[in-house]
């Protein structure tokens, strides 16, 4: 056994009956960001051997579905699926097991490491994108997402992709991550159900004035707050920060 496997968290996991030391990463992330709550329906991607599943079940007490390429030894109260998270058929299997929408999608999926930084980073980004795709399809509006990513030059683009879908996004390395590890966890809270996304451009007519004196344009029934705009004005706007119930936009051009 490698020496570094016998660290503090490794021994603690053995003592406390967790299948993997990574259990403590999920505990620490959840202590800080409170993504899994009592009753949450949780999907865990790349879940073998099952440390995160044990913690997710303790925290939620509700439906927990675990997916991995490898077989996961049965755990009480947890549905396990052997499948590839990059495949559509696996998503369908997870949806059937859930029988509804998920409150939280978590992914600790990691490729087999080749030792070549760029290759491992690219494979990790592929898995993180697959996890985001699944989260977008299975989460209820307002649901939360947690995903592991190996750092590298595609990380910032990936972070932007997550930011487009969630109202608040953080990147965090828990104390239980090994010092030498390139991993970082991205936490997305409050999946957006808005019909607009940050950076999009629209031509709109300002409908009304909000309480703060800014103009309000409606896009597919969704309120977009436009600074320095007056009712009746026809504008080309660029969407800025998007929240659950409204978005902000700036004026590009008066039409
Ligand atoms: C670090 S381990 C997960 C540890 C787990 N969170 C725990 O606490 O026990 C990463 C897992 O991702 C899985 N994995 C990698 N690629 C996958 C894929 N395409 N589909 C499903 N699982 C995958 C691996 O088989 C591996 O079990």
From Swiss-Prot:
Q: What is its main location?
A: cytoplasm
Which Gene3D superfamilies does this entry report, sorted A to Z? Nucleic acid-binding proteins, Vaccinia Virus protein VP39
**Which residues are the signal sequence here?**
none
A cellular-component GO term for this protein:
cytoplasm
* Keywords assigned by UniProt, alphabetized: Cytoplasm, Methyltransferase, rRNA processing, S-adenosyl-L-methionine, Transferase
EC number(s) from the headed UniProt entry: 2.1.1.166
The listed locations are: Cytoplasm
Binding of S-adenosyl-L-methionine, residues:
50, 52, 68, 84, 108
What are the residue boundaries of the TRAM domain, all occurrences included? 195-253
**Classification via InterPro entries:** NA-bd_OB-fold, RNA_methyltr_RlmE, RNA_MeTrfase_FtsJ_dom, rRNA-MeTfrase_E, SAM-dependent_MTases_sf, TRAM_dom
Reactions this protein catalyses: uridine(2552) in 23S rRNA + S-adenosyl-L-methionine = 2'-O-methyluridine(2552) in 23S rRNA + S-adenosyl-L-homocysteine + H(+)
Active site per UniProt: 148
Supply one GO molecular-function term: rRNA (uridine-2'-O-)-methyltransferase activity
HAMAP family given in the database record: RNA_methyltr_E
Task: Sum up the protein's function in the record's words.
Answer: Specifically methylates the uridine in position 2552 of 23S rRNA at the 2'-O position of the ribose in the fully assembled 50S ribosomal subunit.
Q: Which family does it belong to?
A: Belongs to the class I-like SAM-binding methyltransferase superfamily. RNA methyltransferase RlmE family.
Q: What is this protein called?
A: Ribosomal RNA large subunit methyltransferase E
* Organism whose genome encodes this protein: Methanothrix thermoacetophila (strain DSM 6194 / JCM 14653 / NBRC 101360 / PT)
């Amino acid at each position: 056994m490698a020496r570094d496997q016998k660290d503090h968290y490794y021994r603690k996991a053995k003592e406390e009956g967790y299948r993997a030391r990574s259990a403590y990463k999920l505990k620490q992330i959840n202590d800080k960001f409170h993504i899994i709550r009592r009753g949450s329906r949780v999907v865990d991607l790349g879940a073998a051997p099952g440390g995160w599943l044990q913690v997710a079940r303790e925290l939620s007490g509700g439906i927990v579905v675990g997916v991995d390429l490898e077989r996961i030894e049965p755990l009480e109260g947890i549905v396990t699926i052997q499948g590839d998270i990059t495949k559509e058929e696996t998503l369908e299997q997870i949806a059937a097991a859930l029988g509804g929408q998920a409150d939280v999608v978590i992914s600790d999926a990691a490729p087999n490491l080749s030792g070549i930084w760029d290759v491992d980073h690219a494979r990790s980004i592929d898995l993180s994108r697959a996890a985001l795709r699944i989260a977008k399809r299975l989460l209820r509006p307002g649901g939360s997402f947690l995903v592991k990513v190996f750092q590298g030059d595609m990380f910032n683009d990936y972070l932007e992709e997550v930011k487009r879908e969630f109202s608040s996004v953080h990147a965090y390395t828990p104390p239980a991550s090994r010092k030498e590890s390139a991993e970082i966890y991205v936490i997305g809270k409050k999946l957006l159900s808005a019909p607009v996304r940050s950076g999009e451009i629209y031509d709109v007519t300002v409908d009304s004035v909000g309480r703060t004196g800014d103009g309000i344009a409606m896009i597919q029934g969704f309120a977009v707050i436009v600074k320095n705009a007056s009712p009746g004005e026809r504008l080309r706007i660029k969407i800025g920060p998007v929240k659950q119930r409204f978005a902000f936009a700036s004026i590009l051009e008066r039409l």
